Amino acid sequence: MARYIGPKAKLSRREGTDLFLKSARRSLADKCKLDSKPGQHGRTSGARTSDYGTQLREKQKVKRIYGVLERQFRRYFAEADRRKGNTGENLLQLLESRLDNVVYRMGFGSTRAEARQLVSHKSITVNGVVANVPSQQVKAGDVVAIREKAKKQARIVEALSLAEQGGMPSWVAVDAKKFEGTFKQMPERADIAGDINESLIVELYSR
């Protein structure tokens, strides 16, 4: 499956906000001008962005935050739309409960990309069973852990240490000494940090 492998800072500049693709703990704001588009001098335009353009940009931003490609993102939206409740919130909950995102939220990876790599390299177990599919949906009560052979990896130890300092999300409980965590419940919308306006995505797919 094709994925963007270019400079991560360029994606954040394109969206005009830090997507935290390089690190969840270190902001890019001090390193580059997030309000300047990629290009030699930053692309500028006096034209007003259309409603469609604004909606499309929001969708692209969320796809980049979670590392999801278009076809998969459409499937998530279709599932979110089928479920009861608010479609936008359902969409974010589906994305937040992806295994790679849960590994990231528990602090085992410093970025979602790093967490995805840990899953793909079979360094993660779910309820004691080795998991290697980043998109696997984690359910309330599931226990996610680092395999014994991977516990000494410096990047995992460092990421977990930084996550502990910054604080864990309320919907996960992590035992750093055991390198494992429990997905307690689906996060509420207010619990999901990030500059995301999911209603724009719902409007886009409702056109």
From Swiss-Prot:
Coiled-coil intervals, chain numbering: none
Biased composition range(s): Polar residues: 42-53
InterPro entries: Ribosomal_uS4, Ribosomal_uS4_bac-type, Ribosomal_uS4_CS, Ribosomal_uS4_N, S4_RNA-bd, S4_RNA-bd_sf
Location of region: Disordered: 31-55
Range of residues in the leader sequence: none
Record-annotated S4 RNA-binding domain positions: 97-160
Gene Ontology CC terms, in alphabetical order: small ribosomal subunit
Domain of life: Bacteria
Keywords for the protein's UniProt record, in alphabetical order: Ribonucleoprotein, Ribosomal protein, RNA-binding, rRNA-binding
Record's keyword annotation contains Plastid: no
Family named by the database record: Belongs to the universal ribosomal protein uS4 family.
PANTHER family (alphabetical): 30S 40S RIBOSOMAL PROTEIN, SMALL RIBOSOMAL SUBUNIT PROTEIN US4M
Its biological purpose: One of the primary rRNA binding proteins, it binds directly to 16S rRNA where it nucleates assembly of the body of the 30S subunit.
Protein name as annotated: Small ribosomal subunit protein uS4
Taxonomic placement: Bacteria, Pseudomonadati, Pseudomonadota, Betaproteobacteria, Burkholderiales
Protein encoded by which gene: rpsD
